[in-house]
């Protein structure tokens, strides 16, 4: 008589395997770094898709895509997350994008190499990124149009002379990390249909070496890409009008400003479907200030959904208990700006900045999405969450979901989060949920995303 438990039968064991577990039985990797990326990030990607109720075929497809196409581009697995947190970016981010219609999963990564590939020839990674998006575009199941990417790259990438100037040891070694990152790649993993790509250009280095403000670089690039078609110019116009009044300056590593443009992004689709995004950071954390940017000084007041979205931003502002005031990036940067000593710093700051002052790493990110033929750019806000314990962040996300009427997502969020970080005490960690973003459209309602940085912890 067979006395073995039924669950030990091979067919039952096979049926219990998740897509990640099944693929793990078959995959091999070229080195320990690739294997570590798979062991640490693969389960998180698999879980986020299961929790979002992706069908089984999509789970297998996207996990295999991650293993075979993305992991080889990530470079060495960080020996310690601390160094990458300090540099302001880590090679891989997984985000969950929540809407009434369902949850989708997205990846974002900075292409790297195992030995600092040709660093003297490509110190800022522009050539590598061009290679990467072209290679990914050849994968079946990926929909990509590279025409606009190539146009933007020809305008926004550093020239050879600019690279050589910035790569001089006296300059390059003193650049902060955000000035050394040129591109990142975003990957949308839809519940149905094809994978799509997004490319981001960080323009601080270009602005520094060219002495052209990032606003001007961004606006001119969009106008050039538009080529008289009037696809993106209508949506750009209110953005340009609003920020031209601020007299934006070129980027400077030693003189960070309250409002700074950072990046421009492009969804790699044909021009009639592509979307462009302009990103800025804001260190004056006041709701009135956010409301002014959100509406572009009232220019968007008649935009459908803009006021409803702003009211939900107000609710989220309260849920997160934002400390209102001027948040300086670092005390040392403030000292550099003043050229003074710590004893005289407080008095000098009080004169120039009447708001309450904080010396921390807090800031907001906002972007405006410009769509072909649409005169209304769509605002989105990102809250940096590193000052809160991860369980407190989870409480805030649950409160937001309940406020939006997403009862099922609210009931599952904390349990799901704990599954992504099985070896972490979320009462003692912070920054695993790095950002929380929010936008609103009259057509689709609220859209909020959580960005995970501590992958596989």
From Swiss-Prot:
Binding residues annotated for dimethylallyl diphosphate, in chain numbering = 106, 198, 277, 279, 382, 447, 451
Assigned EC number: 2.5.1.-
Put simply, this protein is called: Prenyltransferase ucdE
**Assigned keywords, A-Z:** Prenyltransferase, Transferase
Query: Which GO molecular-function terms appear in the entry?
Result: prenyltransferase activity
Question: Is Protein transport one of the keywords UniProt gives this record?
Answer: no
Q: Which family does it belong to?
A: Belongs to the tryptophan dimethylallyltransferase family.
Lineage of this protein's species? Eukaryota, Fungi, Dikarya, Ascomycota, Pezizomycotina
Please, one GO biological process term?
alkaloid metabolic process
Native source organism of the sequence: Aspergillus ustus
Q: Which InterPro entries match?
A: Aro_prenylTrfase_DMATS (IPR017795), DMATS-type_fun (IPR012148)
Q: What happens when the gene is disrupted?
A: Impairs the production of usterphenyllins and uscandidusins and leads to the accumulation of 3,15-dihydroxyterphenyllin.
Described purpose of this protein according to its UniProt entry: Nonribosomal peptide synthetase that mediates the biosynthesis of usterphenyllins and uscandidusins, p-terphenyl derivatives. The pathway begin with the biosynthesis of 4-hydroxyphenylpyruvate (HPPA) from L-tyrosine, possibly by the aminotransferase ucdG. The nonribosomal peptide synthetase ucdA then condenses two HPPA units to produce atromentin.
* Pathway linked to the protein: Secondary metabolite biosynthesis
- Gene name of the record: ucdE
Main enzyme class = transferase
User: Pfam families, alphabetically?
Assistant: Trp_DMAT
């Amino acid at each position: 008589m067979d006395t073995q438990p039924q669950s030990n039968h091979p067919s039952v064991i096979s049926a219990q395997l998740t897509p990640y577990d099944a693929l793990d039985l078959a995959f091999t990797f070229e080195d320990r770094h690739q294997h570590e990326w798979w062991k640490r990030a693969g389960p998180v990607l698999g879980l986020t898709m299961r929790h979002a109720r992706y069908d089984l075929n999509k789970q297998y497809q996207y996990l295999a895509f991650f293993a075979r196409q993305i992991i080889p581009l990530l470079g060495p697995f960080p020996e310690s997350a601390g160094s990458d947190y300090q540099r302001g970016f880590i090679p891989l981010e997984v985000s969950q994008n929540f809407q009434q219609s369902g949850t989708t999963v997205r990846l974002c990564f900075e292409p790297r190499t195992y030995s600092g590939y040709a660093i003297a020839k490509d110190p800022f990674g522009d050539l590598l990124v061009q290679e990467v998006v072209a290679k990914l575009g050849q994968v079946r199941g990926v929909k990509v149009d590279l025409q606009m990417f190539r146009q933007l790259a020809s305008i926004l990438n550093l020239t050879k002379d600019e690279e050589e100037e910035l790569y001089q040891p006296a300059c390059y070694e003193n650049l902060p990390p955000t000035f050394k990152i040129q591109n990142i790649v975003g990957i949308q993993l839809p519940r149905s249909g094809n994978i799509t790509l997004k490319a981001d250009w960080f323009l601080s280095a270009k602005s520094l070496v060219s002495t052209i403000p990032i606003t001007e670089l961004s606006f001119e690039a969009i106008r050039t890409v538009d080529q008289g078609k009037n696809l993106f110019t209508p949506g750009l116009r209110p953005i340009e009008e609003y920020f031209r009044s601020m007299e934006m300056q070129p980027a400077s590593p030693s003189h960070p400003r309250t409002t700074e443009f950072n990046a421009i992004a492009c969804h790699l689709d044909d021009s009639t479907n592509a979307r462009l995004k302009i990103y800025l950071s804001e260190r004056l954390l006041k709701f009135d200030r956010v409301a002014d940017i959100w509406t572009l000084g009232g220019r968007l007041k008649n935009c459908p959904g803009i006021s409803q979205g702003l009211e939900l931003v107000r609710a989220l502002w309260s849920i997160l208990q934002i400390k209102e005031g001027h948040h300086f990036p670092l005390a040392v940067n403030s000292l550099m700006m003043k050229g003074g000593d710590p004893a005289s710093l407080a008095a000098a700051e009080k004169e120039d900045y009447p708001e309450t002052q904080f010396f921390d790493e807090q800031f907001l990110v906002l972007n405006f999405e410009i769509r072909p033929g649409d005169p209304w750019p769509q605002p989105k806000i990102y809250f940096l969450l590193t000052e809160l314990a991860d369980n407190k962040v989870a409480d805030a996300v649950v409160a937001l979901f309940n406020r939006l009427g997403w009862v099922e997502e609210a009931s599952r969020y904390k349990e799901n989060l704990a599954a992504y970080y099985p070896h972490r005490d979320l009462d003692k960690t912070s920054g695993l949920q790095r950002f929380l973003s929010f936008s609103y459209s009259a057509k689709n309602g609220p859209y909020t995303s959580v960005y995970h940085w501590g992958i596989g912890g």
